[in-house]
Amino acid sequence: MVTRRRLHHPEVEQVSKRQKVDKAESKNKKHADVAAERGEQSTEDHEDESQDKKDKKVVGDNRDEDEEVSPNGQEAAEDNDDRKDKDAKEKDTETNDEGTEKSHTDVNDDDDDVDESKEEDAAAAVDITKEKKDEQESDNKTEEKKVQENEEEEEEDENKNDEDVEELGSTEPVDDEKKGLVKFEFDGVEYKFKERASVIEENEGKIEFRVVSNDNTRENMMVLTGLKNIFQKQLPKMPKEYIARLVYDRSHLSMAVIRKPLTVVGGITYKPFNKRQFAEIVFCAISSTEQVRGYGAHLMNHLKDYVRNTSDIRYFLTYADNYAIGYFKKQGFTKDITLDKKVWMGYIKDYEGGTLMQCSMLPRIRYLDAAKILLLQEAALRRKIRTISKSHVVHPGLECFNDIENIKPIDPMSIPGLKEAGWTPEMDELAQRPKRGPHYAAIQNILVELQNHAAAWPFLRPVNKEEVPDYYEFIKEPMDLSTMELKLENNKYEKMEEFIYDARLVCNNCRLYNGENTSYYKYANRLEKFFNNKVKEIPEYSHLID
């Protein structure tokens, strides 16, 4: 009974309900807002049902009291009092029973709330799991979509590259521009030539060629400093102070290759002698990382056009070291100095170990268009050949060699076009003979080594009779390295012994004419020692050296 009364107390019941409702709400809020709303709705429904039961019970009690109370007589009053006492006892009993029933109902309701809360928690957990699963599936779909997009982009890039390759292999004008090809027509025939990378970059505005001097302007001084740094790096044997002095000398000019905005790639420093119509190229260098793009040749062409158009200079002179001789030869320089010595002797610096080279500029040639001019000359020559020869006619190939099992010799004169080309049986015999002897390659290598040796500069060319008038009175069999090179090209050396004889003759003549204390005598000894060592390195000719 105590338990029933305690459960029947309305405040205890209300606190218990609120605690359970709060607990259910806190759980539901952690899982999902939907579960919380369901829990609140369930709690409100239970409270409404309990309140409806209380209201119905109170209304029933009031009706009973109204029916039992009567206004007539004392007996009625006593009976009424007795009934009131009896009704009060019955009411207490009913109230207790009702409280017991209500307490059982509340307990059942609480159990239902707990069960519903658990069910709602489970439902919320299922919803959260479902949401996570949906999010994961969405992420997977997004990743798959990204991967698919990347694959599509890669395929597009590959297709684009394939299209570019196909375009480069075609003959459309746009593709020729991509490859740097320049087209023009001559006599209705289309000709093409490929521009250097440096020319393409200049046309695109990536590089420029600028003439600068020491005029104290900030930008020109920056360019000169960049040139000085390149010269000092590319010409390590030159004293750095000497390079700086000449680059900043106000009597010198420089043409620089500049990658925009202001990065010096290379250049040429030269000293003009306008009254004597020549200029001395003092330094010429391109940065080591940029030498494969044709900057050197394009720079020299720019310099030739600039000097010829702005002055009376018609010749270039320079002392080239062993590594620069090949470059200067390609740019039109030669070792044969045709310019009178009275014009340049004493005006340019003589470098020990360097080779003096000269370039004579043609007045009617624009060197930047030299490639196109040469191609036009070739086209004109081919046109002339077509008027006197049928060499441009292409005959079908021979079919007699298709059957390999039944090959038979044929008369060369029966081959279409062979006779018209001027072929004779004697020409076949000459063609089968070896052009060079077995010793040609060895002689050529040794001769190149001799010409590039530091002590060879006095022996590169024949002695000038004007400079040394009595030389040929003492030396009856003169010899020099350029004469040996000419004899080699004309197949005059039939044996290695003949080449060795001429090489020793060069040194013997020098020692015969010059005294032992002269530098020329020492140069001859050094060069002969170097020559003997080179021949000994070749096993088949080492026995020829004593």
From Swiss-Prot:
GO BP annotations, alphabetical order: negative regulation of induction of conjugation with cellular fusion; positive regulation of transcription elongation by RNA polymerase II; transcription initiation-coupled chromatin remodeling
Gene3D superfamilies for this protein: 3.40.630.30, Bromodomain-like
Residue ranges, compositional bias (Acidic residues): 108-119, 150-175
EC number: 2.3.1.48, 2.3.1.-
Chief location bin: nucleus
Segments of this protein annotated with the region Disordered: 1-176
Key words, A-Z: Activator, Acyltransferase, Bromodomain, Chromatin regulator, Nucleus, Transcription, Transcription regulation, Transferase
Domain Bromo: 434-538
Top-level EC class as recorded in UniProt: transferase
Residues that, per the record, bind acetyl-CoA: 284-286, 291-297, 323-326
Cross-referenced SMART domains: BROMO (SM00297)
Family per record: Belongs to the acetyltransferase family. GCN5 subfamily.
Biological role stated in the UniProt entry: Histone acetyltransferase that acetylates histone H2B to form H2BK11ac and H2BK16ac, histone H3 to form H3K14ac, with a lower preference histone H4 to form H4K8ac and H4K16ac, and contributes to H2A.Z acetylation. Acetylation of histones gives a specific tag for epigenetic transcription activation. In addition to histone acetyltransferase, can use different acyl-CoA substrates, such as (2E)-butenoyl-CoA (crotonyl-CoA) and is able to mediate histone crotonylation.
PANTHER family the record matches: GH11602P (PTHR45750), HISTONE ACETYLTRANSFERASE (PTHR45750:SF3)
Protein name as it appears in the record: Histone acetyltransferase GCN5
UniProt organism field: Candida glabrata (strain ATCC 2001 / BCRC 20586 / JCM 3761 / NBRC 0622 / NRRL Y-65 / CBS 138)
